Amino acid sequence: MVNLGKDTYPVYIGSNLLEISNIFFPIESNTQVAIITNDVVFKIWNKKITYYLHKLGAQVKNVIISDGEIYKNIDTVEIILSTLLKYSYCRDAVLIALGGGVIGDITGFVASIYQRGIKFVQIPTTLLAQVDASIGGKTSVNHVLGKNMIGSFWQPSSVIINFDFLNTLPRRQLISGIAEIVKYAVSFDVNFFNWLEENLERVLKLDYSALSYCINRCCEIKISIVEKDEKEIHDRMLLNLGHTYGHAIETFLGYGTWLHGEAVSVGIVMASKTSELLGFMKDNDITRIISLLQRVGLPISGPKNMSFESYISNFKRDKKVISGKLRMVLPVFIGNVKIFSNVHENILMSVIKNC
């Protein structure tokens, strides 16, 4: 449960969740439902989701968009809005985000602006979305000049994290999601990091108990922080380890060239080395982080053709910038992160040059 007063909502985690009778709250008989999904997920899972919704008596339409970060933009928002208007969806309609982080972000954003706000349900189908993006109410689309620059805070009515979806997840997407798991461990829980070092192969093999532990632990951390700081005034920024460097890489390369977790992986390494130059992170901790990321199969170095100037120009549009001052989330040691302001450009240049 995410306790946010009037915006409190349940988070269901497990297998075979779709068979639970009240799992699709607040959907009931005659509710107008629009399933927002992509062409890949639609082929595999839509029939099953629709079956259970029809059993409830819901009126269901599908809005199918192309798969990929490149489609997370205002044009896609227009397509979804036009569909809702075409079929006269009312303010008591419910949207379902059936997909990964891209689908969840777009659907939440549409829900926040359609007729000044309607309800939506998150059904994340990727590991990355299950451990991070589906919880907390951040919604957004990208702009050509920056990732997630157009968005809002709009909490879902419920989140359904069903492990069964991971059985059909492409390997690259699975590996990308593990980057966010590593982020949580490095940022908040050294015991979790130690556990990952010992049990990584079980996670990669989709061992049920290992996945359950990882997903539950990440969600516990995320929920505890969101409950304290829903709108990212301070504490919630700590969830952004690796994202300043990572978002810059994604924007430079073009959305979708690298998956989000791949960029975050490099961002975690760069943030760790930035902290080391500031006198905090120890070399042994950085070695352990790099070793774990390499075992996962994630990149640890940025694009060779990305210049220092390209990083800096993207940093200036980072959402953590306040009054022109860049704030970065950096690890102090494994299990602890802090926000640093105005890291000197010479340090940033050294990190970028050597990563």
Curated annotation (Swiss-Prot):
Which sites bind Zn(2+)? E180, H243, H260
User: What is this protein called in UniProt?
Assistant: 3-dehydroquinate synthase
Q: Which GO terms describe its molecular function?
A: 3-dehydroquinate synthase activity; metal ion binding; nucleotide binding
Which gene produces this protein?
A: aroB
Q: Which parts of the sequence bind NAD(+)?
A: 67-72, 101-105, 125-126, 138, 147, 165-168
This protein's UniProt keywords: Amino-acid biosynthesis, Aromatic amino acid biosynthesis, Cobalt, Cytoplasm, Lyase, Metal-binding, NAD, Nucleotide-binding, Zinc
| Gene3D superfamilies named in the record | 3.40.50.1970, Dehydroquinate synthase-like - alpha domain
Location of this chain's protein in the cell: Cytoplasm
Statement: the UniProt record of this protein carries the keyword Metal-binding: yes
Q: Which GO terms describe its biological process?
A: amino acid biosynthetic process; aromatic amino acid family biosynthetic process; chorismate biosynthetic process
Q: In which pathway does it act?
A: Metabolic intermediate biosynthesis; chorismate biosynthesis; chorismate from D-erythrose 4-phosphate and phosphoenolpyruvate: step 2/7
Function recorded in the entry: Catalyzes the conversion of 3-deoxy-D-arabino-heptulosonate 7-phosphate (DAHP) to dehydroquinate (DHQ).
- Which CDD domains does the record cross-reference, listed alphabetically? DHQS
What does the record's cofactor remark say about binding? Binds 1 divalent metal cation per subunit. Can use either Co(2+) or Zn(2+).
What InterPro entries does this protein's entry cite? Dehydroquinate_synthase, DHQ_synth_AroB, DHQ_synth_fam, DHQS/DOIS_N, DHQS_C
Predominant location of this chain? cytoplasm
- Please list the cofactors this protein needs: NAD(+); Co(2+); Zn(2+)
Q: What is its EC number?
A: 4.2.3.4
Q: Which GO terms describe its cellular component?
A: cytoplasm
Which family does the UniProt entry place this protein in?
Answer: Belongs to the sugar phosphate cyclases superfamily. Dehydroquinate synthase family.
